[in-house]
């Protein structure tokens, strides 16, 4: 994606999941928070907006969904300590959603991370993280030797996901994934987070999807990508491949009207 679009925050209006279907009741002060760290579409840097990324904060644990350009800085601006990062979920492997995955992990480590971080996403997320650690092995080794830091690699646990289903559960959250259509990729995922006080669904990039509708049933909050087709045509009108590019972009994403139907 290389055009402007906003992630649309849509409350679904239905009741949240009954309490007995949720993880353990949250302790006082452990309410679930959602922070939109970046809503820009496409990898091209913007003056005022950062790449696709969201944070869900449950107690003192931070869950990051997608790692677009600037995610670590946006966390700092939002007052989210990088050392409290516990899970990273990548929806799909386009660069505007994963370009800062490795940087986020390394910067969290530099910021005092000593607790393992689980990274989830479509293949080849495990290989990508290994490649990033090799790319930065000189800096990492120097910081371990010179600054007395613990090794970074053992702190990162990566998980290649399949087509959907249960992903992770503990006493505070249950995470479920669903496969969504985002050609030409073979696998793109949406995620649902059920906590004691709310249910949040992150669509990632997708066309209108019945699987996403099922995943988001009775959720409290849906963060859904949205594309303005006319705006796409305006942005590409001076490019030599404008017709093919516009046709590709519009067929791979969700219009505002379609998002309304999903919600």
Predicted regions and their residues:
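Binuclear metal-dependent hydrolase catalytic cores
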Residues: 2-5, 9-17, 22-201, 207
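Cap/insert and terminal regions of metallo-dependent hydrolase folds
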Residues: 189-190, 197-199, 207-263
């Amino acid at each position: 994606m290389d055009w402007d679009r906003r992630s649309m925050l849509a409350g679904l209006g239905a009741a949240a999941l009954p309490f007995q279907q949720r993880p353990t009741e949250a302790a006082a002060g452990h309410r679930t928070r959602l922070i939109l760290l970046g809503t820009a579409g496409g990898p091209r840097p913007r003056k005022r907006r950062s790449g696709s990324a969201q944070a869900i904060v449950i107690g003192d644990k931070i869950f990051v969904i997608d790692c677009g350009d600037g995610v670590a800085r946006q966390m700092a601006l939002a007052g989210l300590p990088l050392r409290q990062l516990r899970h990273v979920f990548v929806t799909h492997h386009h660069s505007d959603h994963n370009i800062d995955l490795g940087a986020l992990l390394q910067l969290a480590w530099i910021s005092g991370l000593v607790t393992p971080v689980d990274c989830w996403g479509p293949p080849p997320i495990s290989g990508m993280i290994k490649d990033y650690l090799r790319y930065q092995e000189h800096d990492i080794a120097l910081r371990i030797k010179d600054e007395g830091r613990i090794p970074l690699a053992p702190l990162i646990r990566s998980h290649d996901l399949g087509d959907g289903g249960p992903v992770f559960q503990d006493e505070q959250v249950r995470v479920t994934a669903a496969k969504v259509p985002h050609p030409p990729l073979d696998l793109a995922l949406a995620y649902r987070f059920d906590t004691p006080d709310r249910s949040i669904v992150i669509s990632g990039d997708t066309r209108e999807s019945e699987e996403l509708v099922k995943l988001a049933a009775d959720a409290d909050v849906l963060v859904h990508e949205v594309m303005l087709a006319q705006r796409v045509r305006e942005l590409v009108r001076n490019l030599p491949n404008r017709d093919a590019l516009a046709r590709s972009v519009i067929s791979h994403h969700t219009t505002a009207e379609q998002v309304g139907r999903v919600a």
